[in-house]
């Protein structure tokens, strides 16, 4: 078949698929029937699904990492121990993939020594901001044949609040694959973390999704196989650490509609367990491909399995491609979280699920399905709201949340520590169990903090004078170059000022140090910051006047208490800057258009319009919660250009113009200091003196 013929055939199939989908959506069907028909069609005709829209190629500047793939990002969290309360509000059950050890079958199908790590380590970023390869941190590229690996996993899971692992169990008509880790967990008395099994009852296919015709090993369901299966897993269910609902062992099935007779299968299992000393069991299925009422198929409960069964909007077209041939699909993970956390529970037993991200590019090179913009904080909020709200009326035995997943490294669903963010996902899991989902917005003076970047030390005293003389006690954090820490420390000691001093590499001007500190302060529940820096603008002859005007507006007598109070009483106030220095982004974009485009795409924010404002000079009051779109992007220091005295066109200059966009994207408002103080000021008719408008 010629290339032209294939193209015509593909277009015809895409058109027919669109017609079928439109008709399918208007037919009145129950969710269960709709899901079953969809699965039937995709199992047989997955190649009919049109390719997603392509991203953008040939952008001006490449922002692909060039040095290394294991750099810690803003938001990296180190291991830390924090005591958990004796009673947790829910049992968290994380799905666990046992594919991290070689077996003869995988050797034959994928090559000698294959484990999931081979997929993980070969992956390349497909677009700018695509965080691949994702590499493990403290646990390394582990081999599950080593017992200490699973012991360490169990210890970490318990320290960070997880209540159980749910192991995928692979059974093919009497043949098991990847069972060794489960057997090891079952037998190791030093491991006390409970576990349960989920029978992944799909065929294995070379596509990695249980679909397609290139089958590696198939299922052969029958009544005899039902009995052989339950007899095999019974030894695990007899284990005292096997997870129970009440006193009933919990057994999951991944795709119940692949069972020819699920009602009869469930009955056979129950009867066998009653007759063989197990007693009653609790049967649940995973809502990965279908959503029947579990009672209709002889089961007791269902388990949500995000990101499956969700349709967040595609953001593929916005992406700045690294691989111009990338034909995968990029979706907005934040919309997945927003949708799932608001879903009501059903009138049957449904265990809610959460997900810390998804990216199966390692298994589908150049064609991955990627859920972008996942972040530990937003995952924490999703999990906390699920526990606090969705489970509010659940009986104690049913207060379970399933997490997809503990270690799906080749599908980007991972709680284990990674090189980029460390223990951030585990830390977020623990926080979700120990703090309210919505932090109080009331602000008082002790929660307001000054973050001052000191590069020009000859004006540091002037700025410290302004802080001290404002009349309001403020926590002071001074960032500076690593070579200037001692001199800054001597300055504050000489003045008798209480301040914290932090040294950073001279990269990213005042912006990168501020992002590091702001990220930490947000985790400490500090709500409000005043961002300052020792601005001189040595390429100008009026840099001192620029700095002086902003200090007067931001720290003038009797202003600080009033500004803090204004933020406290107006929860939508996100950023306040001096009125004379709050400018339209589009009129002062300078040489920053490409970097600004990168930031809007990287954070999933809207491009600037005529109403978008920025604080020229980068000094302002800000609610840290309003900066989350920027902080939750987890930028790397290496993305900031090395210091060469640039006066425009760097990522730091672009972020100066982007901060206001982040604030509005978070749902907050950019305003002026004067408006927060109730001061009416006549706008100046003179051109802005400290920057030129874009031509």
Curated annotation (Swiss-Prot):
PANTHER family, sorted: GLYCOSYLTRANSFERASE, RHAMNAN SYNTHESIS F
Gene name linked to the record: wxcX
Taxonomic classification: Bacteria, Pseudomonadati, Pseudomonadota, Gammaproteobacteria, Lysobacterales
CDD domains attached to this UniProt entry: Glyco_tran_WbsX
Protein name, entry field: Uncharacterized protein WxcX
Coiled coil: none
Pfam families in the record: Glyco_tran_WbsX, RgpF
InterPro entries (alphabetical): RgpF (IPR007739), WbsX (IPR032719)
Taxonomy, superkingdom: Bacteria
């Amino acid at each position: 078949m010629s290339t032209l013929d294939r193209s015509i055939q593909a277009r015809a199939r895409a058109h027919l698929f669109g017609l079928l989908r439109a008709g399918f959506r208007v037919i009145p069907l129950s969710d269960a029937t709709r899901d079953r028909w969809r699965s039937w069609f995709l199992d047989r005709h997955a190649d009919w699904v049109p390719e997603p829209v392509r991203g953008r190629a040939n952008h001006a500047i490449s922002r692909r990492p060039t040095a290394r793939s294991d750099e810690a990002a803003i938001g990296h969290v180190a291991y830390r121990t924090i005591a958990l309360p004796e009673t947790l509000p829910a049992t968290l059950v994380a799905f666990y993939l046992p594919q991290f050890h070689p077996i003869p079958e995988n050797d034959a199908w994928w090559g000698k020594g294959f484990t999931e790590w081979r997929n993980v380590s070969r992956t390349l970023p497909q677009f700018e901001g695509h965080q691949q390869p994702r590499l493990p941190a403290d646990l390394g590229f582990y081999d599950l044949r080593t017992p200490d690996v699973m012991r360490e996993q169990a210890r970490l899971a318990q320290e960070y609040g997880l209540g159980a692992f749910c192991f995928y169990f692979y059974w093919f008509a009497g043949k098991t694959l990847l069972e060794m880790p489960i057997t090891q967990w079952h037998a190791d008395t030093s491991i006390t973390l409970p576990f349960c099994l989920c029978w992944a009852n799909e065929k294995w296919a070379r596509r990695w999704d249980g679909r397609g015709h290139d089958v590696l090993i198939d299922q052969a369901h029958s009544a005899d196989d039902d009995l052989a299966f339950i007899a095999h897993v019974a030894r695990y269910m007899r284990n005292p650490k096997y997870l129970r609902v009440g006193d009933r062992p919990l057994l999951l099935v991944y795709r119940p509609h692949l069972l020819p007779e699920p009602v009869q299968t469930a009955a056979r299992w129950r009867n066998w367990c009653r007759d063989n000393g197990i007693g009653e069991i609790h049967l649940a299925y995973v809502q990965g491909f279908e959503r029947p009422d579990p009672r209709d198929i002889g089961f007791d409960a269902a388990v949500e399995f995000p990101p499956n069964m969700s349709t967040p909007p595609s953001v593929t077209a916005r992406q700045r491609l690294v691989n111009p041939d990338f034909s995968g699909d990029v979706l907005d993970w934040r919309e997945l979280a927003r949708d799932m956390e608001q879903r009501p529970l059903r009138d049957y037993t449904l265990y809610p699920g959460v997900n810390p991200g998804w990216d199966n590019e390692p298994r589908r090179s150049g064609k991955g399905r990627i859920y972008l913009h996942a972040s530990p904080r937003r995952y924490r909020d999703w999990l906390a709201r699920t526990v606090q709200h969705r489970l509010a009326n659940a009986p104690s035995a049913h207060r379970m949340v399933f997490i997809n997943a503990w270690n799906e490294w080749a599908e980007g669903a991972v709680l284990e520590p990674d090189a980029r963010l460390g223990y951030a996902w585990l830390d977020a899991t623990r926080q979700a169990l120990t703090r309210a989902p919505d932090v109080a917005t009331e602000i008082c003076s002790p929660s307001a903090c000054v973050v001052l970047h000191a590069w020009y030390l000859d004006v540091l005293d002037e700025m410290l004078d302004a802080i001290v003389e404002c009349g309001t006690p403020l926590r002071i954090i001074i960032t500076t170059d690593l070579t200037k820490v001692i001199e800054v420390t001597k300055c504050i000691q000489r003045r008798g000022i209480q301040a914290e001093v932090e040294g950073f590499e001279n990269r990213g001007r005042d912006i990168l140090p501020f992002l590091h500190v702001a990220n930490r302060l947000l985790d400490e529940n500090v709500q409000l910051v005043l961002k300052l820096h020792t601005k001189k603008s040595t390429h100008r002859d009026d840099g001192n006047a620029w700095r002086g005007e902003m200090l007067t507006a931001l720290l003038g007598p009797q202003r600080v208490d009033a500004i803090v109070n204004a933020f406290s009483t107006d929860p939508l106030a996100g950023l306040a800057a001096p009125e004379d220095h709050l400018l339209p982004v589009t009129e002062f974009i300078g040489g920053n258009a490409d970097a600004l485009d990168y930031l809007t795409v990287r954070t999933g924010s809207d491009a600037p319009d005529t109403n978008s404002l920025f604080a020229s000079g980068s000094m302002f009051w800000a609610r840290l919660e309003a900066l989350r779109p920027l902080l939750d992007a987890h930028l790397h220091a290496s993305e900031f250009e090395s210091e060469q005295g640039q006066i425009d066109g760097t990522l730091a200059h672009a972020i100066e113009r982007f901060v206001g966009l982040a604030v509005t994207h978070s749902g907050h408002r950019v305003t002026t200091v004067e408006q927060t103080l109730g001061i009416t000021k006549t706008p100046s008719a003179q051109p802005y003196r400290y920057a030129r408008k874009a031509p």
